[in-house]
């Protein structure tokens, strides 16, 4: 089976072309291929299919075999993969479990993505806790050692954004895992830890649902900016700094789409012997 590996800010993905060939058992295959010791090694597998409602359809499989609704870094890599190996078209719409996602290749490795409008009610995220208007802005979640406050946002997948004073002193693994699996989140959640450097510059670390700590998360960066605006901590256009690099994120108005711009780079290609 032929594959190409891409990375977006160190968030790495195995891309396969299912336009030409049929592959069964994608969830099990994704878990196998993503294994960094016995497989190719990646945070996720992305398969590109034909679509009746968009240019292409993608399915994303996490390294644990689960299937998320959406992945911001992954969608940029999918755009670059299609341009490089299937059809050299600079504007593409992808069918995803989170709905249609529009992408544009701006430069050689720079992709802009219309991530759609954020969903902000607790029922949409989903989250079992809400404030008086049905949202989940700066709400407490009970943990073993007490409570932690955060803001719930869905970017097609659930996020809980926690603002911290010093991100270097934050135990991302311990707190992230506990929040991800908290009963307040019926579908579990991604967890972002965000330090506001200035209103237009954020520093973020992420615990991804079904993966763990990764170098970057595109939907998480978008959710972090939205949460920053909702908590009056940030401007609507900001640079989000992650362990793997930087993303530019913009939320022009309430109800508008969130736009994310960042890199997608090919790492290598090969053939996996099953």
UniProtKB/Swiss-Prot annotation:
Family: Belongs to the diaminopimelate epimerase family.
Protein name as it appears in the record: Diaminopimelate epimerase
Protein localization: Cytoplasm
Organismal lineage: Bacteria, Pseudomonadati, Elusimicrobiota, Elusimicrobia, Elusimicrobiales
Catalytic activity, reaction form: (2S,6S)-2,6-diaminopimelate = meso-2,6-diaminopimelate
Protein's pathway: Amino-acid biosynthesis; L-lysine biosynthesis via DAP pathway; DL-2,6-diaminopimelate from LL-2,6-diaminopimelate: step 1/1
Function text: Catalyzes the stereoinversion of LL-2,6-diaminopimelate (L,L-DAP) to meso-diaminopimelate (meso-DAP), a precursor of L-lysine and an essential component of the bacterial peptidoglycan.
Active-site residues from the entry: 71, 217
PANTHER family per UniProt: DIAMINOPIMELATE EPIMERASE (PTHR31689:SF0), DIAMINOPIMELATE EPIMERASE, CHLOROPLASTIC (PTHR31689)
Record-annotated site: Could be important to modulate the pK values of the two catalytic cysteine residues: 159, 208
HAMAP family given in the database record: DAP_epimerase
Residues that coordinate or bind substrate: 11, 62, 72-73, 157, 190, 208-209, 218-219
Record InterPro entries: DAP_epimerase_AS, DAP_epimerase_DapF
Gene: dapF
């Amino acid at each position: 089976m032929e594959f190409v590996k891409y990375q977006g800010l160190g968030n790495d993905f195995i891309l396969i072309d299912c336009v030409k060939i049929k592959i069964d058992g994608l969830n099990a295959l994704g878990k196998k291929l993503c294994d960094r010791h016995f497989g190719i090694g990646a945070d996720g597998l992305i398969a590109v299919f034909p679509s009746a409602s968009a240019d292409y359809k993608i399915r994303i499989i996490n390294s644990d075999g689960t299937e998320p609704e959406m992945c911001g870094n992954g969608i940029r890599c999918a755009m670059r993969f299609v341009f490089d190996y299937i059809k050299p078209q600079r504007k593409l719409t992808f069918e995803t479990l989170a709905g249609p996602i529009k992408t544009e290749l701006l430069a050689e490795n720079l992709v802009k993505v219309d991530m759609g409008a954020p969903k902000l009610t607790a029922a949409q995220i989903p989250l079992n806790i809400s404030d008086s208007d049905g949202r989940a802005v700066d709400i407490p979640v009970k943990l073993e050692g007490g409570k932690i406050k955060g803001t719930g946002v869905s970017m097609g997948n659930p996020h809980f954004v926690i603002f911290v004073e010093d991100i270097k002193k934050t135990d991302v693994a311990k707190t992230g895992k506990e929040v991800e699996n908290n009963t307040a989140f019926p579908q579990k959640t991604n967890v972002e830890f965000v330090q506001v450097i200035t209103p237009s510059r954020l520093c973020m670390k992420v615990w991804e649902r079904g993966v763990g700590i990764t170098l970057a998360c595109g939907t998480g960066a978008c959710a972090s900016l939205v949460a920053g605006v909702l908590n009056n901590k940030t401007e609507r256009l900001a640079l989000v700094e992650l362990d793997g690099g930087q993303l530019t994120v913009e939320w022009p108005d309430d109800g508008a789409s969130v736009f994310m711009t960042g890199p997608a780079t090919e790492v290598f290609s090969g053939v996996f012997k099953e």
